[in-house]
Amino acid sequence: MAFQDLLDQVGSLGRFQILQTAFFCICILIAYPHMLLENFTAAVPGHRCWVHILDNDTVSANGTEILSQETLLRISIPLDSNLRPEKCRRFIHPQWQFLDLNGTFPNMSEPDTEPCVDGWVYDRSSFSSTIVTEWDLVCESQSLISVAQSLFMVAQLLGGLIFGHISDRFGRKIIFRCCLLLFAISGTCAAIAPTFPVYCSLRFLGGICLMNIITNAVSTMSEWTGPKSIALMTGIILNSCNIGQILMGGLGFVIQDWRTLQLTMSIPLFILFLFSRSVLESAQWLIITNQLDEALKELRRAAHINGKKDTGETLTIEFVKSTMKQELDEGQTNVSLFDLLRPPKLRVRIFYLSFVRFAATIPFLGLMLNLQHFGSNIFLFQIIFGAVTFIVRCAVLLTMNHVGRRISQMVSSFLVGIPILVNIFLSQEMQTLRVALATLGIGATTAIFTTHTVHHNELVPTVLRSIAIGLNAMFSRLGATLAPLLMILTVYSPDLPWIIYGVSSILAGLVVLLLPETRNQPLPNTIQDVENNRRDSRKTKQEDISMKVTQF
C-alpha cells in the first residue's frame, strides 16, 4: 500500500512504536483486570442465617454459653442434602431435642423453618468485604450478581457499536482518551457507590469504555506498524491483558476489602489519562480522512522519535498527496455500518470473521464458568490462568509468522473443541486430567483471540476498521451472553452444552479457512482495496511510488 512507503521513511518499527506500545500496554494492564474484578469484589463467601441464640451476645451470655458453637448451630440451622448447614433457612424455634443424640423421634414432624429474616453471618476468612456481604446478595438475591455481570457484558457490546463508529469519524486518539477518563471516573465512583443499583450503573458505564480502550490501542498500533511486525505489536498489547490477570490475582489476595480493591485498580487510570496526551494519532487514518496537515505533523513526530529527523523534514503535503492520491479520492465520503456490509467481498469477510469470533467466545466462557468449580483457591487459580495465557500468546506470535493466520486459528480451534468433547467421556474422579484438558482449552482460546485480532485488522480497510472491530466485538459479547444460557440445556442432557461448546469451536476452525491469508501483506486502506484484491496492482503501484520518491 502507498502508506507503507510513507511508514518506511519514518520508521515502521522503531523507538516510537516501542514507546507507544509500552504505554498502551500499561493502560490495558490496569484496565483489563476490571473485567475480572467481580471474581473478587462479588465473591460469594460461606454464609448462614443470623441466629438469635448464636449471634446475639446478650442471649449467648444468658445460659447458652456452656454449649459449643457447633451445638448451637445444630439446633438452629437445618442441614441440606449434603448434611451441611443450610445457607438460606433456619428453624423458627431452637430444636432442643436434637441435643439428645441417642433419642429417636419417629412421630416427630419436620421442624418448621423460615428464611433468614434477620440477615446473614458471613465467613470473612478470605474476604473481609464484598458487594455480596455489603448488600446481602445471597439466597433469593444471589441472581442479582449475574445481573451485574450481564450488564457489564451488554455494556461492552453497546460500547463497541457506538464508539466503533465514532472512532472512525473522529479518530482513535480522542476516543481512547475519552474512554480512559470515563473508565477512571466510573471505576472510582463504583468504589464509593452507596447502593447496588448505583454500583451496577457505574459498572455499565465502565463496560462501555473498556473494550474501546483495548480496540483503539490495537487499531492505532496496527496502523503505525509495518506488515511484518503487526502480529508482534498486537500480541504484545494483548499479552498485557494476561499480565493484568496475574496482577489481579495478587492484589485480590492482598486487598480483601472490595472498595479498596476497586479504588486501587481505578486511581492509576487518572495518571495514565494525563500521559495519554503524548499519544500520536494514526497518521493513516488522518490521511484517509483528508486531515493532511495533522497527518504530516504526526509523521514528522514519529520520524523524529525514531531518529530519522532529516527524513521527516523532507516530507511535504504535496508528497503525501501524490503518494496516496487514490486513497484520498476514495476516502472522502463519510462511512457507516452499511458501507461495511454493502460491498460483496467485504460483506463475506465480515460474516466469516463475526462467526469465528462468536463461535470462539462461546466455549471460552463455558470453560471459564466450569473452571471456577475446580479451584478452591481462586487467587492462585487466577495467577496460574494468567500465566498460562501469557505463555500461549507468546507462542502463537511465532506460529502466526511462520504458518500464517488461518492455520494458527484452525489448529487452536481444534485444540479447544477436541479437549471439551474428550472431557465428556471422562469420569468426575479423573479431576486432574479434566482440569488439564480444560486449561489446554483456555490456552487455545487465547491463541484464537490473539490470531483473530491480527487477522481481522489485516482484512478490513482503514476507513472502516473501528466500525468493523465494534461489530466483531458485538458478536463476541453475544457469544458471551449465550454461553451461560446454554447450561440450561443440562435439564435434557448434562453433556449437551459441552457438545455445543466443542462443536462450535471446531466449526470456527473450519470457517476460518474460507478467509484469505494475510501474513506479510500490507493493510488495506479503502473498500476498493478489498473488493479488487489488487495484489498485482499493488506491486505496480509500489514501483510507481518508488520512481516518484527518486524524482522527489
UniProtKB/Swiss-Prot annotation:
GO terms for biological process: monoatomic ion transport; organic anion transport; steroid metabolic process; sterol transmembrane transport. The chain crosses the membrane at residues 16-36, 144-164, 178-198, 204-224, 235-255, 267-287, 350-370, 378-398, 407-427, 435-455, 469-489, 496-516. Residues 524-552 are annotated as: Disordered. CDD domains: MFS_OAT. GO terms for molecular function: transmembrane transporter activity. Keywords: Cell membrane, Ion transport, Lipid metabolism, Lipid transport, Membrane, Steroid metabolism, Transmembrane, Transmembrane helix, Transport. It catalyses: estrone 3-sulfate(out) + glutarate(in) = estrone 3-sulfate(in) + glutarate(out); 17beta-estradiol 17-O-(beta-D-glucuronate)(out) + glutarate(in) = 17beta-estradiol 17-O-(beta-D-glucuronate)(in) + glutarate(out); taurocholate(out) + glutarate(in) = taurocholate(in) + glutarate(out); glycocholate(out) + glutarate(in) = glycocholate(in) + glutarate(out). It comes from the Eukaryota. Residues 531-546 have a biased composition (Basic and acidic residues). It comes from Equus caballus. It is found in: Cell membrane. It is a multi-pass membrane protein. Pfam families: Sugar_tr. This is Steroid transmembrane transporter SLC22A24. Belongs to the major facilitator (TC 2.A.1) superfamily. Organic cation transporter (TC 2.A.1.19) family. Renal transmembrane organic anion/dicarboxylate exchanger that participates in the reabsorption of conjugated steroids, as well as bile acids, driven by an outward gradient of dicarboxylates such as glutarate or succinate. Transports taurocholate, estrone 3-sulfate, and estradiol-17-glucuronide (17beta-estradiol 17-O-(beta-D-glucuronate)), but not androstanediol glucuronide (5alpha-androstane-3alpha,17beta-diol 3-O-(beta-D-glucuronate)).
